[in-house]
């Protein structure tokens, strides 16, 4: 039986940056018996022909993450599709992908040690999807009992990671549909003055990818007003 103190999960909320949050989350994932994790935010509302703003926090191999983003795998990955359509977690393995458009993606994932796992939605299905998942290098028929036994801890971990990411991104817990957040306003203000992404990041003390995420969301809010 697992015995992970609740304080370990609360410790995620005091992470000073995404690197520290990744390290602390990975430590918990390993203690749960898995090899790596992925947290994903995708804002589906966007102008035609443009890619949606995407934020990923992960300990998976960077090459796999690049593949996932390059081919927009969140659009057909069964775990991501489930997160977009449901409120409850799901376990996954080869059977989830067999005979689907995502089958080649699963074969790629296997090469990076991602053979089975669980995924947890952390916001209600809407124009923005957010979810957390972890995986291990075992086929589902072997790992399923352990996955099922640890899913309550996984849901708890998903919630804390989601809150920690929102804090670091300076996102409100329930933003108004068309209202800019304070951080979005700051990024837009500097962008209007001609600052580049890296300059905005330096001015605000955040990462360039966080700047891009805020600018992308701000653009989408403007497009639906």
Model regions and ranges:
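Short helix-to-turn junction characteristic of helix-turn-helix DNA-binding domains
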Residues: 191-195
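The N-cap/first-turn positions of alpha helices
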Residues: 183-187, 212
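Helix-loop-beta substructure at the N-terminus of cytosolic sensory domains
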Residues: 15-51
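Juxtadomain coupling helices with adjacent low-complexity linkers
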Residues: 1-11, 18-19, 132-181
């Amino acid at each position: 039986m697992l015995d992970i103190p609740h304080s370990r999960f609360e410790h995620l909320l005091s992470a000073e940056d995404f690197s520290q949050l990744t390290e602390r989350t990975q430590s918990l994932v390993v203690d749960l018996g898995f090899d790596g994790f992925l947290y994903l935010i995708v804002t589906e509302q966007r102008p035609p022909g443009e890619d949606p703003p995407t934020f990923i926090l992960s300990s998976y191999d960077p090459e796999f993450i690049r593949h996932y983003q390059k081919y927009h795998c969140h659009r057909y990955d069964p775990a991501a599709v489930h997160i977009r359509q449901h409120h409850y977690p799901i376990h996954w393995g080869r059977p989830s992908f067999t005979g689907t458009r995502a089958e080649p993606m699963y074969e790629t994932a296997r090469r990076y040690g991602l053979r089975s796992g669980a995924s947890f939605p952390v916001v209600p299905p809407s124009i923005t999807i957010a979810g957390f998942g972890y995986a291990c290098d075992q086929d589902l028929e072997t790992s399923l009992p352990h996955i099922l036994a640890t899913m309550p801890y996984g849901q708890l971990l998903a919630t804390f990671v989601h809150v920690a990411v929102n804090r670091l991104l300076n996102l409100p817990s329930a933003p108004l549909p068309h209202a800019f957040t304070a951080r979005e306003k700051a990024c837009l203000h500097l962008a209007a003055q001609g600052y580049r992404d890296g300059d905005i990041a330096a001015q605000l003390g955040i990462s360039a990818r966080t700047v891009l995420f805020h600018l992308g969301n701000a653009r989408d809010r403007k497009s639906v007003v």
